Each structure stands twice: as structure tokens, then as C-alpha cells.
């Protein structure tokens, strides 16, 4: 899982659209999942978009791996992912544990982040929210054709690298 996530991150950050975005940490999985911290190296960097794209890319990769493991009667868990700014990390962890469903992406970003991803993704609200965070949280509901095509290409590149490595 860790190797797959790192490879996905490396391949994704090569995309011209995400120029100026870099990872602060070297992500790894533990009993709580994995955390990737991204930063903007300049004012034009689309760090919120990079977070959403990485989350979706990981879901796409995990689905393939999960389905393959099930087919081979091996144990595998479906993934849940969340995208937030650093200030909302704890809130996102709570949301992932309370309202997130398998193979779903939750997004908890300030308005500037939501504006940045607005022309690339569609979101919906959490159904029947009971907390402030649940009201502020968005659920990924699809991406633009161009973004999804780009992610499919990156996914294929990661899978090709994985099978050769």
C-alpha cells in the first residue's frame, strides 16, 4: 500500500497542472491509514486540487488492487479517503470514522480551496448532517472529463511501474 501511494504521488506531481506542488512528508501506512501533506511552492500552485486528485487516484488504484485480491481470495480492504487543510486534519479523521463510506472521498476545505477545485470536480453535501463538520464537508461526486482522463493515464503509468518494479 505504501509503495503504491508513494508511486501515485510521484507520478501525479509530474503533471504540468500541479506545477509548484510538493509533498512535505514521505507518506506511509500505519494502523490509522496514511497521511500525505502537500504544500504550495508558489502562489499559483493548486495544492487543494493536487490533494483531491491524489485522493481520487488512490481510490482508483485501490479498487483495482482490492478487486484483484478478492478475485484471488486474498484479504483486502476497500479504501476511504479525505482531503482537508492542515487545520482540519482532526476533523477529517473524525468524519472518515463517522460518515465516510468505502471507496468514498470526503473534502473539508476552506473557501479558497473549494474555489480552486470548483471547475474540476463536482461535490454533494453529506446527507443528514448532525455536526458542524458534517455540514461543511463535501463528498466527491465526479470529476471533469479532462481531470478523469488525466488520472486514468497516471493510474496506468503507476500500474505499469508497479508491475515492472
Describe the function of each predicted region:
Residues 21-39, 67-89, 106-109:
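A short glycine-enriched loop-to-beta-strand structural element that forms part of the catalytic core
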Residues 2, 10, 37, 73, ...:
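Residue-identity detector for threonine
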Residues 60, 87-88, 94-165:
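Intrinsically disordered, glycine/charged-rich C-terminal tails and inter-domain linkers
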Residues 1-50:
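Catalytic NTP-binding/metal-coordinating core of nucleotidyl cyclase/transferase enzymes
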Residues 14, 18, 60-68:
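Conserved helix-loop functional segments at active or binding sites
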Amino acid at each position: 500500500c505504501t509503495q503504491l501511494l508513494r508511486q501515485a504521488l510521484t507520478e501525479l506531481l509530474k503533471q504540468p497542472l500541479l506545477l509548484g506542488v510538493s509533498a512535505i512528508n514521505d507518506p506511509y501506512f500505519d494502523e490509522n491509514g496514511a497521511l500525505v501533506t502537500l504544500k504550495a511552492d508558489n502562489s499559483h500552485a493548486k495544492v487543494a486540487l493536487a490533494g483531491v486528485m491524489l485522493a481520487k487516484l488512490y481510490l482508483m488504484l485501490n479498487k483495482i488492487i482490492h478487486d484483484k485480491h478478492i478475485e484471488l481470495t486474498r484479504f483486502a480492504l476497500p479504501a476511504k479517503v479525505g482531503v482537508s487543510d492542515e487545520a482540519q486534519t482532526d476533523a477529517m479523521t473524525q468524519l472518515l470514522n463517522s460518515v465516510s463510506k468505502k471507496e468514498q472521498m470526503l473534502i473539508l476545505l476552506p473557501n479558497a480551496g473549494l474555489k480552486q477545485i470548483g471547475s474540476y470536480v463536482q461535490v454533494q453535501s453529506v446527507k443528514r448532517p448532525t455536526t458542524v463538520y458534517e455540514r461543511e464537508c463535501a463528498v466527491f461526486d465526479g470529476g471533469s472529463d479532462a481531470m478523469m482522463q488525466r488520472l486514468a493515464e497516471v493510474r496506468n503509468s503507476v500500474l505499469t511501474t508497479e508491475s515492472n518494479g
